[in-house]
Amino acid sequence: MGVKDNIITPYFEDSTVFCDFINGAVFKGKQVLRPENIEQLPRELIMQLPWETDGRSNQKTLIRDTVKQAYFHTMYVIFICENQSEVHYGMPVRMLLYDSVQYGEQMKKRQRENKKTGDLKTSAEFLSGLHKGEKLMPVVSVVFYYGDSPWDGPLSMEEMILLPDDTAELKEYLPGYKVHLIDARNTDPDKFSGDWKVILETLRCGNCKDDLIRYVESHEKELEELSAKASRALLTMLGRDIKAEKDKEEFTMCRALEELKEEAKMEEEIHVIRKLLKNELTPAAISHWLDMDKAYIDRIVELQ
């Protein structure tokens, strides 16, 4: 797994974290899922590829980010969260494929169980391997997007399929699959409990360093109360580099604030120096007037 996967995926695997996210994303803040009623399912799915028949393996392993089975309202549901740091322009096809394989796995399991018990009665049941009226568990997939840029990709199969106006009759025959996207920019943080409210509010600042500094300064108490895992996940979502020497339990968002301020100060200094260089001041003169190390200014000149 990549660095982001090594931090964010394990964060979602925590049952309380996952329940808080799904309760906000799917149930609009109602506390429906409870940690004691969910269990982890395998992330790997085996997909048959019938078109690969030239001697290569006709199986492909799909790995989903977080897969949980939840029991509520006398039923089981499979909830899945996929994490995205970048826009994916084929997301509807990708998610439709993943969910289809998930349903296929359920069906194969039912078919094996029915074959083992030997209680299929009609020829239609024997053919399908399922009892008449047999139901599968719902599969609910949510995409959590934390990228810097607003999502500008398709969120439905309809958006991906070429359908001219004079062929509108075909629309009802095409899959109506939709991607359920959670993006901090258009999500109400108040629907989320636990650390998620603060995480989503912080992510709303996007890549605007000034907005992020203002938010962190005005929400210092809430950020300090984030768990160590939540702080590390949030910093990773923000694209902050968690260096090895800082990769400790006590590293928090508020400790990262000082780095943000230093970076903002440095960026302002570089902006001023480049402006003076453009006005044909020499590095030596700039060093004198700004009381800065000339070697630092020389490095900026080299990078121009």
Residue ranges and their predicted role:
Residues 1-304:
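Elongated, amphipathic alpha-helical interaction scaffolds
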